[in-house]
Amino acid sequence: NVVYRFGHSMLNETVDRFDPNFNDQSMGLIEAFLNPLAFDASGTLTAEEAAGSIVRGMTRQAGNAIDEFVTDALRDNLLGLPLDLAALNLARGRDAGAPSLNEARASFFAQTGDTRLQEYANWEEFAFNLKNPASIINFLAAYGTHPSITGAATMEEKRDAAILIVMGGAGAPPDAVDFLKGQNGWCAQSSGLKDVDLAIKSVGGKGVPDVIHASLMPWE
């Protein structure tokens, strides 16, 4: 249910195509998706010729990184509608009963004994294993249970609260370090870390070819 979606983060804004003379016939990602007649130029190309133009283009196109980011066309304009593919993927996973990130890691560790697959004990450990360290702000804003986050009314306020927890400074809560380190009353269960979705399509992790790293924030 989750594994195949890693490719969503690799897509970019165009479907590159070249005719046999290498004239550029590229299309925008959403335009190509919504216009199947363009595949064979409304029947003027054979299936082989149409596929060939895509092969010539896509084999020369660099994909986006496998990470927690999704190109704008999929994040803001899926199917030509104001839909977010990343958020839909998270919802599908939950509906299908996909485990959380830590639940999956615990299962993989039990099966393999590989200590690299143990559950994350706290937010600090989780952040250390992110490919993009600054993304911890978004994960905290989405999943963190610190009162300064849960008490915030808007997405911007939640991110501001998360920034204060991570960066410190004036206005930072006195238990910010305890919250991040999972100590003095805070742990993976109580801090919200246990709720981070498993979303392999948006590999947030580094190191192990981590089919068990985390999810994309719907607003990222």
Where are these regions (language model features)?
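Terminal regions of secretory-pathway proteins
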Residues: N1-E220
